[in-house]
Amino acid sequence: MTESKNSFNAKQTLEVGDKSYDYFALSAVKGMEKLPYSLKVLGENLLRTEDGANITADHINAIANWDPSAEPSIEIQFTPARVLMQDFTGVPCVVDLATMREAVKTLGGDPDKVNPLNPAEMVIDHSVIIEAFGSTLALAKNVEIEYERNEERYQFLRWGSKAFSNFRVVPPGTGIVHQVNIENLARVVFDNNGLAYPDTCIGTDSHTTMENGLGILGWGVGGIEAEAAMLGQPVSMLIPRVVGFKLTGEIPAGVTATDVVLTITEMLREHGVVQKFVEFYGNGVKSIPLANRATIGNMSPEFGSTCAIFPIDEETVKYMHLTGRSEEQVALVEAYAKAQGMWLEQDAPEAEYSEYLELDLSTVVPSIAGPKRPQDRILLTEAKEQFRKDLPDYCSAEPVDESLPAKRMDSEGAVQKEGEDVAGYNSSRAGHGESAAEGAAGRQSNPVVVSSPNGGEYTLDHGMVAIASITSCTNTSNPSVMIGAGLIARKAAAKGLKAKPWVKTICAPGSQVVDGYYKRADLWKDLEALGFYLSGFGCTTCIGNSGPLPEEISAAINENDLTATAVLSGNRNFEGRISPDVKMNYLVSPIMVIAYAIAGTMDFDFETQPLGQDIDGNDVFLKDIWPSTEEIEETIAGAISRELYEADYADVFKGDEQWQNLPTPEGKTFDWDEKSTYIRKAPYFDGMTMEPAPVSDIKGARVLAKLGDSVTTDHISPASSIKPGTPAAQYLDENGVARNDYNSLGSRRGNHEVMMRGTFANIRLQNQLVDIAGGYTRDFTKNGEQAFIFDACQNYKAAGIPLVVIAGKEYGTGSSRDWAAKGTNLLGVKAVITESFERIHRSNLIGMGVIPLQFPAGESHASLGLDGTETFDIEGIEELNNGVTPKTVHVTATKESGDQVEFDAVVRIDTPGEADYYRNGGILQYVLRNMINA
């Protein structure tokens, strides 16, 4: 760490018990005491890293004199204390770092300089896929398959953990990165050789903001930005606007943390908080348990803010003690926060904010969200009605004719294979005439009778719940909703209720602690009675690793075009994300996952319809089995303790026997295997010189894709399974990979050849240039014929034709995945023109040398009459060669008729630092050149 110039004489001593720490006191700078908590953290960061060049006294004064009403205009350099990664985004980071070592050597530099300067930690959580479920064998089987598929990736990561200093890997099977972070990795306050400072952390996953619940300032970034931060490059940002979100009242009985966070998500997305900090304050904060705060922080990317932070208070240190942090660490956090004015005092004057919102927690009611966006909140009491309103958008709208018999699937070949019970087939799930078409009058219906391999039959229909998954760090980190799920399962099982036989039931907690307290509370037997067996420790359903549905169910859905649904306790429900067989996805609490598994359909009113009958034939309603707040709290008190966390995290980096026995390559540089379909040397530095080439205007570009609103990074670079016949599958076929070994696109992010072919390949992508969903476009080198996007890009590249993408609002929402920008770059796209961008993806595009542009205010591709067949010329980019970032560039779109549409597009290069990245062809090239010149 570079020694601070300490212009304000802020370095002081803090006594905590019998230990002394140095720290940079905010009280040394007038004005800092009035700032919101989040800006105090930024202020300390600048004080501590002041070098007189990139970070000066003027920057420190600028934040101390922050004007809440001003629009962001002052650039600062933020230096995070650490970097957090998961394996899907982390593998390409390590690939890039390994490639950079070779590039530095080639350009005459010292390859040993390519090393993380601050702690960088990775948790392997994105690779486990739920192939097996509904059995005690499910966990072992899924782990076995995970290692078989990912051995090469895991060997590479083990090499990285030895080859790079300051880089540690939490092995697979431990939990989900954000849950492991808040339960173990997060420091809250760092002790770096006697220097105390706030724990700040950026991560290669957008839900890194879960740590905001602990008072840790941080957010998700693309992998390329994380790599730069690891190598000492500060994060360039503007001092943001801060939205103060006042919480009052208390959460009422029967309302879960999930209900609260969905309400907040709806409010903030409607308000508009992109590029802003959100900070929670008010008397209601003290009543919110830390786990609930973490759940709220986790959803920050879903409402679009940079962070969603809670200050440090008594609840913070209480949670740190519970989760096994040392008494010395807990004492430091409390003393430091109080010394810096970062401790939440209930009677302290409120900070001034840029904008204000308020929520009385007592007004929150049970809710779900869907069918395709987290902000689309639905009152539980209106869920059936809303489902029926949305259904016509997903299936043909013929009226129901209940006199017609249900179709019957041919059961030939539906024979149970040896060991198939681990995939969810067991006698209790055989089917005994249950029907998802019951009560279908008034909605679209297409009943299909399916025979179970175990005997019996059942009827599927639109709205059937195909997947019910207790998943994701968002909720599995929260004991109240997880214990609640176990208790509702206990009550349901006692009354003889079961999940419907067509529901794939999954329980995949975010840490082993959940398994521990379920065992202590003896809840597993109750969950298992409803089909919810332990399936894995990882992200699973939430990122699309739901695994295949049973063959006969998948066939019935696809052959009859049924609109299947999924319910999950996750944070994202974007189209095509959860399963290729599922069209409508709903976010619900873990408790409601159980309820919907029993109901078996989204076409269900929990107030008026019984879930079933008990052994005496009495109707059982949701209210009859809903656990009380007292029951949940009593169970938590008896099942959860500090010792549980201490035992599970005693040696978090060690891993199981399989991990320890993996053969691991040696050496400072990696020995690339050109035949590998998982790990390939990155192409970003090929042909790179020490002097960057001048940037140039874009001439004669064609439109690769014309897209609508809310295009997600899932649409751009899906992480899901690889569909046979697509360019990515063709590449794997050509390289001898069997279809059942395709794995997922996310698992192959270390191979750019696969990822290029998977870019814009989401099965639900709606490219308005063509009339079919998926990764298709029109190839204007072939007279505009329909083609796979990758194939068309190869033809454009051969012809020397640059490409542009045009889109609507909220382009790039969702995951932080930098492959959405990397793939865009490698396909030959030079500019993306939209109505608005989501924060992380805009930054990632610049980091990969793609210029983000916005249509003039109030304009869109539709209002300008652009249909995507035009040829685009973009003038004014070359001003960047003169050290000037133009406010706008001139765009001329020439139609096939010769008519022209002209407009001035807003350049979304927002900071001088971003301009430097773009001039260098990307952030990694910029960092590499600076590293060699240092």
UniProtKB/Swiss-Prot annotation:
SUPFAM superfamilies named in the record: Aconitase iron-sulfur domain, LeuD/IlvD-like
EC number: 4.2.1.3, 4.2.1.99
Pathway(s) per entry: Carbohydrate metabolism; tricarboxylic acid cycle; isocitrate from oxaloacetate: step 2/2; Organic acid metabolism; propanoate degradation
Cofactor remark: Binds 1 [4Fe-4S] cluster per subunit.
BP GO annotations: propionate metabolic process, methylcitrate cycle; tricarboxylic acid cycle
Biased segments, Basic and acidic residues type: 404-420
Disordered: region residues: 398-454
CDD domains, A to Z: AcnA_IRP_Swivel
Keywords: Iron, Iron-sulfur, Lyase, Metal-binding, RNA-binding, Tricarboxylic acid cycle
InterPro entries named in the record: AcnA_IRP_Swivel, Acnase/IPM_dHydase_lsu_aba_1/3, Acoase/IPM_deHydtase_lsu_aba, Aconitase/3IPM_dehydase_swvl, Aconitase/IRP2, Aconitase_4Fe-4S_BS, Aconitase_4Fe-4S_dom, AconitaseA/IPMdHydase_ssu_swvl
Amino-acid positions noted as binding [4Fe-4S] cluster in the UniProt annotation, renumbered to this chain: 473, 539, 542
Coiled coil: none
Biased composition (Low complexity): 427-445
GO molecular function, one term: metal ion binding
Domain of life: Bacteria
Functional note: Involved in the catabolism of short chain fatty acids (SCFA) via the tricarboxylic acid (TCA)(acetyl degradation route) and probably via the 2-methylcitrate cycle I (propionate degradation route). Catalyzes the reversible isomerization of citrate to isocitrate via cis-aconitate. Could catalyze the hydration of 2-methyl-cis-aconitate to yield (2R,3S)-2-methylisocitrate. The apo form of AcnA functions as a RNA-binding regulatory protein.
Similarity field: Belongs to the aconitase/IPM isomerase family.
Protein name according to UniProt: Aconitate hydratase A
